[in-house]
């Protein structure tokens, strides 16, 4: 369960991924905390709620923030790295 990073470590071990080869996309702070604990880049999914405090935290702490699924899709296919 988030924010425990076990799931990310398990994926890295089983699929031989390095932290920088992964991206956690989540809409809440526990997902952010989980990604940080595993040293995995994090992106904020801001389309899932309209709570100003959550959006402010995400925008203030996350390098990648997406307001729509379309924005995230465009990022995924842009070839840019997190």
Feature annotation, model-predicted:
Residues 1-82:
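Asp-based, Mg2+/Mn2+-dependent phosphohydrolase catalytic module
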């Amino acid at each position: 369960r988030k924010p425990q990073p076990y799931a990310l470590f398990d994926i890295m071990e089983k699929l031989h991924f390095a932290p920088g080869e992964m991206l956690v996309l989540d809409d809440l702070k526990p997902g952010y905390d989980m990604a940080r604990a595993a040293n995995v880049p994090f992106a904020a999914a801001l389309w899932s709620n309209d709570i100003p405090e959550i959006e402010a935290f995400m925008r203030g702490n996350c390098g990648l923030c997406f307001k729509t699924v379309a924005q995230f899709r465009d990022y995924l296919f842009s070839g840019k790295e997190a």
